[in-house]
């Protein structure tokens, strides 16, 4: 990903020409120079394959230092007359050249290894491809091969730590609902900051893409690279390209793994006896009598009466799922010069860490390319996917987080199951009883994508391409909540069923005209396009409760008392015109201009259209004549860009008045149907606009032994849609206006090193990115626990600076405090303005909720038939909070963890033991205000992936008729280095620690086979 290099020309490639007839591979004439013709020669033969065992078609096989050579045929075979003392040189674009002495051998089996520097050269950009060495915008890329075999639960998790400037956070480990957040160069707006994602040119979701189908992923980060997508590109663009057929005989491959999951981190709760002792301590601290006697505590400790004095390990009881996962992929790839195909089937299954939780996915993909005539090419991209996500339900909702909340907050002093088999209960219920009852939520997502293109060659260099595509999604769901009966006779309910059906469809039509021309050292490329997209969404819901039996799951079985039905529909359309011009002089001076004009139905007439230009330029200094004698410098390019982008990702119909139905009224003693406007509209709203400057350079040293890339950017987003406060006398909810502004500035640095020492090949690469966010304009300031104000980073923590713990009642009495209840053992806060009191004016910014620094580094090694991969990912300068009950413990009698053993102990108004936590309190809450004690440093470094593989030797594979077989073991989320409390994952969303399904580590064994 981080390595960029120039393709070096083969010493023989300029003498070999291959047509469309495969027979030409065998009929290419060899040129024998005079020296060769004078020597004694012999015939040799062999096969050239890649590291997967597949034949390399068209590889150059030449006698070194001569033009005596040939190219391999469709099966990778060659035959050549050559002197015995000659050296055979084998080369092919994208692979490392090999030199082999002929000696007395007559048969050769040659394996070419990939040159990662060269394979990285061409990257996918908007509506086309570009040589990386000629890029003038900021683009990061990763190949599908770099993701192959990783046991991650989704594609976004696979990308963590691999793309500079891209921050990816997985908020939970729940199967199918990981809650992954992707941010490119920070948060660009107060509204939707998600990037635009396209799969094979159509806007779509990456959740339904089979990772093994991916050829490459490109991330367009700056305005120059992304502006060709205009309306939705303000937060960056992710382009996913799937694999296409290649010329050659059919190649059948299988890739699969089986794995097991476990929680990365989970809370360690106090035993019942410990809880009772510390609970008593908290009661005494508040001046109340102890709740547990010494006899009670001893019974909890010895376990003699488990029905009345239990020690229930709620989290262990909850995490009883198998955690088993397996993934299987079969693909067929091949074709002729006229027709190529790529077909794949995939199945993925993930069982949860808790019972009745799972994620199952099926994928089918067919990509086809056909050269109908010399001037007409036709192709299709089609895929079908089906995902079924199952989760247990509880009496409150279908939120799986409620199970973890209960398992974390119910003290071990409450019984789970009595000796007679009935269930005990806490005031909120029993999460184990909920699971065993068998209520569940099922969501079945069906996703069909189909597109077809036809490309006409009009004249040399001029083509016209038409594309038609449809993206159809169908989400069919049911939530079944069961009534629970407990051992004490109490009932928790009611039982209920909710059905929903959500359908949405996008139709895309595009026409693209491409032209390229080379005139001497001048190279020109131009593109003009038009696009139309229409989107429609329909949602239907129905709900009933109080079923006569828990086993009834159809709506008709429920009561009509309290039933509800609802439905909604949405239509949206986008029209676009776009173009691009590229100019390249002698590979040294590079220019690019993009322009896109978009019209969106989300805005009123007169405000729908926006125009988004961008400019970029590059200078390859290393190609100048005055640089030719600097042999340690292979490549040096400086580049810069400026562009304007748009964002219309906001709620629909905001320019239209909102009318609420069902507002009935009495008219002449008769209740009449009524409707009323509830929210003011603003017909003047328009695009959020982003202007971005990017300056950078790319350099390669010592035959690309070391590669460096650097970017500085300044991104300013204006006209952000925000609610402007209105007087209460206005009478309606305030409308949105283009009233906000935000700036992101940052740098990105990437380093790469590739080398070979003997039989050891290795590739080390890494990056570091820094982003600083600042709100420039915001009409509705909020100074709560998370600040939303001009001059500060968006959503930063805002509270008191904690300076320690009061050591005595006297110290607390003589110090500025924020509560009359503050005593020895409580938190001490800084009086920022020195006015002798602690109040809201003493609050300060405590830290960012979004990391300012992201980084990652990767190591790939090969030794003979062994390979090794390690991938690390980290963030810094970021802060998180956890759930209040989990943070403090004992809140209103809730549970506590072993961390709370390290508390401050107070006797007779003085601290006798200073701990990390202040003194334990049960009901008093003055320590729980937002402060630097609560907003904790969540920086971390995580070993995301570790993989060791072994390729079976070719001698063995021949006997079992395989081209390639590779065995590997792999792990994900294996180690985390952080100062964040070890009960919680630092990646989890703030405030949800304790409410969230934990992140998972995955250990897997896999197999790759090529037939």
Regions found by a protein language model. Name each.
Residues 763, 848-876, 928-977, 996-1011:
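Conserved C-terminal beta-signal and adjacent last beta-strands/turns
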Residues 345-351, 591-600, 642:
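Transmembrane beta-strand segments that form the barrel wall of outer-membrane beta-barrel proteins
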Residues 167-171, 227, 622-629, 956-958:
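Active-site phosphate-binding and catalytic loops of NTP-dependent enzymes
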Residues 133, 175, 246-311, 322, ...:
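Surface-exposed loop/interface segments of Gram-negative outer-membrane beta-barrel transport/assembly proteins
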Residues 242, 330-334, 364-370, 450-456, ...:
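Residues on the lipid-exposed face of transmembrane beta-strands in outer-membrane beta-barrel proteins
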Residues 48, 112, 203, 454, ...:
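Hydrophobic beta-strand positions in extracellular immunoglobulin-like domains
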Residues 1-365, 372-373, 377-385, 449-450, ...:
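Short, small/polar-rich motifs associated with maturation and membrane association
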């Amino acid at each position: 990903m981080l390595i960029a290099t120039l393709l070096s020309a083969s010493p023989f490639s300029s003498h070999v020409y291959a047509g469309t007839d495969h027979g030409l591979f065998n009929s290419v004439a060899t040129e024998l120079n005079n020296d060769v013709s004078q020597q004694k020669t012999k015939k040799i033969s062999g096969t050239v394959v890649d590291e997967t065992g597949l034949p390399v078609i068209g590889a150059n096989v030449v006698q070194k230092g001569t033009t005596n050579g040939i190219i391999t045929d469709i099966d990778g075979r060659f035959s050549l007359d050559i002197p015995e003392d000659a050296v055979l040189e084998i080369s092919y674009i994208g692979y490392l050249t090999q030199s082999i002495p002929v000696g007395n051998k007559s048969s050769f089996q040659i394996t070419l290894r990939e040159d990662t520097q060269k394979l990285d050269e061409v990257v996918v950009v908007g509506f086309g491809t570009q040589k990386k060495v000629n890029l003038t915008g900021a683009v990061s890329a990763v190949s599908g091969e770099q993701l192959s075999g990783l046991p991650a639960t989704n594609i976004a998790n696979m990308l963590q730590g691999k793309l500079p400037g891209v921050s990816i956070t997985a908020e939970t480990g729940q199967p199918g609902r990981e809650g992954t957040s992707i941010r490119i160069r920070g948060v660009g707006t107060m509204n939707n900051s998600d990037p635009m994602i396209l799969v094979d040119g159509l806007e779509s979701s990456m959740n339904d893409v089979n990772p093994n189908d991916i050829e490459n992923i490109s991330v367009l980060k700056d305005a120059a690279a992304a502006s060709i997508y205009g309306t939705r590109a303000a937060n960056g663009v992710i382009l996913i390209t799937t694999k296409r057929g290649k010329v050659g005989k059919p190649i059948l491959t299988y890739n699969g793994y089986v794995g097991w999951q476990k929680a990365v981190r989970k809370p360690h709760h106090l035993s019942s006896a410990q809880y009772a002792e510390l609970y008593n301590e908290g009661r005494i601290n508040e001046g109340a009598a102890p709740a547990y006697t010494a006899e009670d505590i001893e019974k909890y400790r010895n376990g003699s009466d488990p029905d009345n004095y239990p020690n229930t390990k709620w989290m262990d009881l909850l995490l009883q799922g198998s955690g088993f996962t397996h993934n299987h992929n079969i693909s067929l790839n091949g074709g002729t010069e006229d027709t190529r195909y790529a077909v794949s089937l995939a199945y993925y299954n993930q069982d949860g860490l808790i019972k009745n939780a799972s994620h199952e996915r099926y994928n089918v993909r067919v990509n086809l390319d056909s050269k109908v005539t010399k001037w007409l090419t036709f192709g299709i991209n089609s895929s079908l996917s089906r995902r079924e996500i199952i989760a247990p339900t509880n009496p409150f909702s279908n939120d799986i987080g409620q199970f973890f909340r209960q398992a974390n907050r119910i003290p071990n002093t409450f019984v789970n199951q009595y000796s007679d088999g009935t269930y005990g209960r806490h005031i909120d219920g029993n999460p184990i009883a909920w699971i065993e009852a068998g209520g569940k939520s099922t969501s079945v997502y069906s996703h069909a994508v189909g597109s077809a293109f036809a490309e006409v060659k009009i004249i040399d260099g001029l083509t016209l391409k038409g594309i038609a595509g449809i993206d159809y999604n169908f989400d069919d769901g049911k939530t079944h909540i069961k009534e629970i009966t407990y051992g004490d006779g109490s009932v928790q309910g009611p039982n209920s069923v909710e059905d929903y059906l959500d359908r949405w469809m996008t139709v895309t039509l595009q026409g693209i005209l491409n032209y390229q021309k080379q005139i001497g050292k001048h190279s020109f490329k131009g593109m003009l396009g038009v696009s139309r997209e229409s989107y429609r969404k329909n949602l239907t819901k129905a709900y009933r409760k109080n079923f006569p039996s828990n086993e009834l799951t159809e709506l008709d079985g429920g009561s009509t008392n309290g039933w509800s039905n609802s439905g909604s529909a949405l239509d949206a359309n986008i029209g676009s015109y776009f173009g691009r011009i590229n100019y390249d002089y002698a590979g040294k001076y590079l220019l690019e201009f993009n322009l896109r004009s978009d019209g969106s139905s989300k805005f009123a007439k007169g405000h729908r259209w926006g125009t988004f230009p961008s400019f970029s330029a590059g200078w390859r200094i290393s190609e100048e004549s005055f640089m030719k004698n600097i042999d340690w410098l292979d490549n040096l390019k400086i580049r810069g860009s400026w562009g304007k982008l748009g964002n219309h990702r906001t709620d629909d119909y905001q320019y239209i008045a909102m009318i609420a139905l069902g507002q009935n009224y009495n008219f002449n003693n008769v209740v009449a149907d009524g409707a009323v406007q509830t929210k003011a509209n603003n017909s003047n709203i328009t695009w959020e606009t982003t202007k971005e400057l990017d300056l950078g350079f790319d350099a390669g040293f010592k035959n690309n032994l070391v590669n460096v890339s650097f970017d500085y950017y300044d991104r300013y987003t204006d006209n952000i849609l925000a609610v402007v406060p209105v007087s209460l006398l206005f009478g309606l909810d305030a409308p949105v206006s283009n009233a906000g502004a935000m700036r992101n500035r940052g740098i990105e640095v990437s380093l790469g090193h590739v080398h070979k020492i003997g039989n050891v090949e290795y590739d080390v690469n890494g990056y570091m990115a820094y982003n600083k966010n600042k709100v420039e304009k915001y009409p509705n300031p909020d100074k709560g626990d998370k600040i939303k104000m001009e001059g500060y980073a968006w959503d930063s923590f805002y509270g008191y600076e904690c300076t320690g713990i009061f050591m005595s009642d006297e110290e607390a009495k003589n110090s500025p405090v924020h509560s009359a209840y503050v005593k020895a053992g409580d938190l001490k806060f800084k009086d920022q303005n020195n006015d002798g009191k602690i109040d809201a004016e003493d609050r300060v910014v405590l830290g960012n909720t979004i990391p300012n620094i992201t980084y990652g580094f990767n190591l790939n090694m090969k030794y003979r038939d062994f390979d090794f991969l390690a991938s690390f990912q980290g963030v810094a300068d970021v802060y998180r909070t956890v759930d209040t009950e989990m943070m403090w413990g004992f809140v209103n009698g809730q549970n506590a963890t072993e961390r709370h053993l390290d508390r401050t102990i107070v006797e007779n108004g003085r601290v006798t033991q200073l701990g990390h936590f202040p003194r334990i309190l049960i009901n008093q809450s003055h320590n729980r205000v937002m402060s630097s004690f609560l907003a904790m440093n969540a920086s971390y470094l995580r070993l995301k992936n570790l993989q060791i593989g072994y390729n079976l030797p070719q001698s063995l594979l021949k006997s079992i008729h395989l081209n390639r077989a590779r065995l590997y073991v792999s792990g994900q989320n294996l180690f985390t280095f952080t100062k964040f409390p070890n009960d919680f994952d630092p990646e989890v969303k703030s405030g949800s620690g304790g409410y969230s399904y934990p992140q998972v580590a995955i250990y897997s064994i896999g197999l790759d086979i090529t037939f």
